[in-house]
Amino acid sequence: MAKGKFERTKPHVNVGTIGHVDHGKTTLTAAITTVLTKKFGGEAKDYSQIDNAPEERARGITINTSHVEYETETRHYAHVDCPGHADYVKNMITGAAQMDGAILVVSAADGPMPQTREHILLARQVGVPYIIVFLNKADMVDDAELLELVEMEVRELLSKYDFPGDDTPIIKGSAKLALEGDQSDIGEPAIFRLAEALDTYIPTPERAVDGTFLMPVEDVFSISGRGTVVTGRVERGIVKVGDEIEIVGLKPTIKTTCTGVEMFRKLLDQGQAGDNVGVLLRGTKREEVERGQVLAKVGSIKPHTKFTAEIYVLGKDEGGRHTPFFNGYRPQFYFRTTDVTGAVELPAGTEMVMPGDNVSISVSLIAPIAMEEGLRFAIREGGRTVGAGVVAKIIE
């Protein structure tokens, strides 16, 4: 049977559930699809369908992730849920599932636990911009004061990691009761309150085409009589014929002008996010551009060599290293289309990093890369992926 046509009428937002093991992330995911489907249509998913998450690969790393979708009055949501803690770490660091906002699930009976804290920290490090809290298992707590105490703890924890704890929406409910169709305040109505919080608290994300122009350079050709053509896939924004643009990274930044855009051998007047194009550059020599640089709107992105990052190191069973690495480790960092060697500095007090760990590090690259916070990269040794990371903060 054919799947229903995807109606692109409502704005699209990516979200996901995060939080400690057994606090009810998957049950809540099932409850959201079940309750919202009754009102807005779509497909309900039960717990077992979500819990049996298929494997996918991102940046050479295998991750188990479940994807569900649902609609509210005003939006279409794609929602990710992961079965295990390690899958969350990998998912957030590789950006396999970019989240415009996260639903932090906290059991009202237990309060914040170690993974609650770790997921909030990860969300901060990898640039998840908004968190909404679902205080789950409210049916197991009779004491209103206890509920308030847990809520205060969660708000303090969010504030500690630079989220606006005092202004964060916290919805109290029971995913289990909602799933069973319970009509009390903590049953189905709690799911509708959560949906309303998603709709109002998470702003509609900027579409890629509305961003500032950026295109990673994949290949460079010289066409006699016409000049230099750079090919690649436009990551965001639009480039028009006649635009002044910059070539950034690896070498000193140079300005040039786009004198032509072609796609599938046809000349266009512009290329936009998602297009695989060739961009003709006026007066630029073939040897002035190379793979690993980017074409970008003038002044929009700068080259950097030093940054802090959150990384996940592949386990031995994932094809990663078999041994730990230490301070001064020098692998290659693969940004967009090229490898650059860099030296790793471990945080004070961390002796070594084992395969399977995630850790915050500082990196010094031997050549500058066009970089902004939130940029993803792979860590490689001789072409083999041994880890993944995301730029947390640029130092210089």
Swiss-Prot record:
One of its GO terms (molecular function) is GTP binding. Residues 19-26 are annotated as: G1. It holds the Pfam family GTP_EFTU_D3. One of its GO terms (cellular component) is cytosol. GTP binds at residues 19-26, 81-85, 136-139. Residues 136-139 are annotated as: G4. The keyword Ribonucleoprotein does not apply. Residues 81-84 are annotated as: G3. Keywords: Cytoplasm, Elongation factor, GTP-binding, Hydrolase, Magnesium, Metal-binding, Nucleotide-binding, Protein biosynthesis. Belongs to the TRAFAC class translation factor GTPase superfamily. Classic translation factor GTPase family. EF-Tu/EF-1A subfamily. This is Elongation factor Tu 2. It comes from Methylobacillus flagellatus (strain ATCC 51484 / DSM 6875 / VKM B-1610 / KT).
